[in-house]
Amino acid sequence: MKKLLLFVVSAIMLVPASVKADEGMWFLMFIERLNHRDMQKMGLQLTAEEIYSINNHSLKDAIVQFNGGCTAEMISKDGLVLTNHHCGYDAIAELSSAEKNYLKNGYWAKNRADELKPSSLYVRFFVRMDDCTKRILSVVNPSMSEADREKAINAEIAKIEKENNEGGKYTVSVRPFFQGNEYYYFVYQDYKDVRLVGTPPESLGKFGGDTDNWEWPRHTADFSMFRIYADANGNPAEYSANNVPLKPKHHLPVNLGGVKENDFAMILGYPGRTNRWMPAGGI
């Protein structure tokens, strides 16, 4: 499964010394039909509508894709974004110089005027998704050559993306799943005025490097903070001194109390891909 998609990756019960996990990846639009009842039995207190809704603000509005490859979270009503240090690494490196080495020394803006704008950075909000399998597969037939099949599918994908981008307001992506047997389109909204708020020194943020990256528990301050700016109406805008912090539809409160035994937990984000359902013959 490709990037750019928003999934519930796993739902788990936190139990000391052992973790019982219902592992896998699921589309948010199928949460109510496939997973919600089991998640409630495990302790989930949110409704399916509070996790994914296209008509009201929901949890999906607080989980964003950061610069095309990472997951990040909205953690304030004023557009503050939390992500990993390694996800913000390129932006931090771009803003650094021999005189102001933010990678080495870290950086914290004392006020919003001190927040720093890298040249190329964006945050992507997930708006909605839908199934377009029947439409895509209706333009192909078994007698087609592979080249003709690909051409027909790509032409239909281009139509779907154009029909749903509302004149360029949204980014639309059609993606194949299950070896091209299912197709879904995803609608996103991109914000490009994203500024660095704070980062720890590289010695903390990248401590352990890729060796520790795959281990748990970790002892790494692997985080960085940014802020999204928008025009006065909350719409995406190019960088301007007149832009204001985005008021997100939803943000996550930070609980300083930590987790307790038997608390419900789940992961919501933008993973890479999975071959979980590949048959034995395909391995």
Language-model segment annotations:
Residues 3-11:
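Sec-dependent N-terminal signal peptides
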Residues 4-5, 16-283:
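Terminal presequence/propeptide segments associated with secretion/organelle targeting
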